[in-house]
Structure formats: structure tokens, C-alpha cells
Amino acid sequence: PYEKIGAELVKEVAKKTDDVAGDGTTTATVLAQALVREGLRNVAAGANPLGLKRGIEKAVEAVTQSLLKSAKEVETKEQISATAAISAGDTQIGELIAEAMDKVGNEGVITVEESNTFGL
């Protein structure tokens, strides 16, 4: 039963991360696993579960504020291309994404589908 609860938790973390960010599910899954493992270890050693929860919430807030403070707006087509190329691991794909985003605008939607056609 505990394994099923853990699996459901990880599934929910991955889904929520994908819904909100569209990326980072592996990182979120690893972080969730570490939080659960270390949380259980600390509770077993006598830590107060509510105090642990409050500490985690404070840490999340601090990390969030730090990330927001260091975040940079991606505004130009070149910046979008460079960022997309890093995410995709391919400069040509980065350029395609930047071109698509340039065409649809900031509020537009880009749908990517797998193709069975070679080279397209």
C-alpha cells in the first residue's frame, strides 16, 4: 500500500510539473523522491512532521524568490532561438521554434506532432 501511495505521489508531481512548465518532469520526480526519503528518515529519527513541512515550505519560498530574482526575460527572436536550441539540443530545431513563435506571437499556440515522413 505504501508503494502505491508513493507511485501516485510521483505520478502527480510529474503530471503537475508537465502541466505547469511543460518540462522538468525528471527533475521534479527526483526531487520528490529525495523529499519523501529524507522526510521519512527525519520523522523516523524523531523530527516533528509539521515542523518539517513548514521548513520545506519556507525552503520552497526562498528558492522560488531566488529563481524569480535571477530570471531573465527572453524577448528577441535570437534569444528564443538560443534558449530553444539548448532545450532541444539542436540549433536547427531552436531556429524552427523561434520562427514558429515569431509567427504566432506571445499568445499563440504551437503544436508539435510526430511524423512518419522521413526528413519532414
Swiss-Prot record:
GO biological process, one term: protein refolding
GO terms for MF: ATP binding; ATP-dependent protein folding chaperone; isomerase activity
Record Pfam families: Cpn60_TCP1
Domain of life according to the entry: Bacteria
Matching SUPFAM superfamilies: GroEL equatorial domain-like
This protein's UniProt keywords: ATP-binding, Chaperone, Cytoplasm, Isomerase, Nucleotide-binding, Stress response
Coiled-coil parts of chain: none
Catalytic activity from the UniProt record: ATP + H2O + a folded polypeptide = ADP + phosphate + an unfolded polypeptide
GO cellular component: cytoplasm
Enzyme Commission code(s) on record: 5.6.1.7
First-tier enzyme category under EC: isomerase
Principal localisation: cytoplasm
Binding residues for ATP: D23, G24, T25, T26, T27
Keyword Isomerase recorded: yes
Protein localization: Cytoplasm
Subunit structure: Forms a cylinder of 14 subunits composed of two heptameric rings stacked back-to-back. Interacts with the co-chaperonin GroES.
Primary role: Together with its co-chaperonin GroES, plays an essential role in assisting protein folding. The GroEL-GroES system forms a nano-cage that allows encapsulation of the non-native substrate proteins and provides a physical environment optimized to promote and accelerate protein folding.
Similarity section: Belongs to the chaperonin (HSP60) family.
Name under which the protein is recorded: Chaperonin GroEL
Organism whose genome encodes this protein: Mycolicibacterium vaccae
Lineage: Bacteria, Bacillati, Actinomycetota, Actinomycetes, Mycobacteriales
